[in-house]
Amino acid sequence: MKHKVGILGGTFDPPHLAHLHMAEEAKKQLELEKILFLPNKIPPHKHISGMASINERVEMLQLMIEGIDSFEIDTRELMRTGKSYTYDTMRDMIIEQPDTDFYFIIGGDMVEYLPKWYHIDDLVKMVTFVGVNRPLYQPEVPYDVVKIDMPKTTISSTEIRNDIEHAEAFLPEKVWSYIKEHQLYGKK
């Protein structure tokens, strides 16, 4: 029997409670063995200024998943030079773990961008895409996407960075403490 592993990619700048809830809900609803958090360095679809460093983002992710045995961090995309594509990462993971079915978890807002992903026609044969439903957001795409429901959460890392003074309620306590201690995103 194949293993079932979920992958949640993103910049995680910063990682927040919606990321944690997405992972928990995907694991529960799809009966996944574990979730790999896949931080990326230069997402092909984003241009972000004021980012936390790679090390800071990984440290915040570690703080967020601390004590959850079925959650792990895979830093391979951070080691790549240039842009990092999901296709390349998944190709490598499938070679390394041929006995695993991968479930790539994306927010409802990313589903509509799937047709623009690098080698998407091959990628949809390699992984099962899992779209997390967001309130009032139900995009349709020409690919099979397993949809899971999640309690209402509409926060994003961008909104947190832009209003860090009011972000505490959306962050795990240890991540909030880390942001304050390291004065990230202008937090003093």
From Swiss-Prot:
Which catalysed reactions does the entry list for this protein? Answer: nicotinate beta-D-ribonucleotide + ATP + H(+) = deamido-NAD(+) + diphosphate
Give GO MF terms, alphabetically: ATP binding; nicotinate-nucleotide adenylyltransferase activity
Q: Does the keyword Coiled coil apply?
A: no
Gene Ontology terms describing biological process: NAD biosynthetic process
Entries under InterPro entries matching the protein: Cyt_trans-like (IPR004821), NadD/NMNAT (IPR005248), Rossmann-like_a/b/a_fold (IPR014729)
Keywords from the named record: ATP-binding, NAD, Nucleotide-binding, Nucleotidyltransferase, Pyridine nucleotide biosynthesis, Transferase
> Which protein, by its recorded name, is this?
Probable nicotinate-nucleotide adenylyltransferase
Give the source species. Answer: Listeria monocytogenes serovar 1/2a (strain ATCC BAA-679 / EGD-e)
Q: Which gene encodes it?
A: nadD
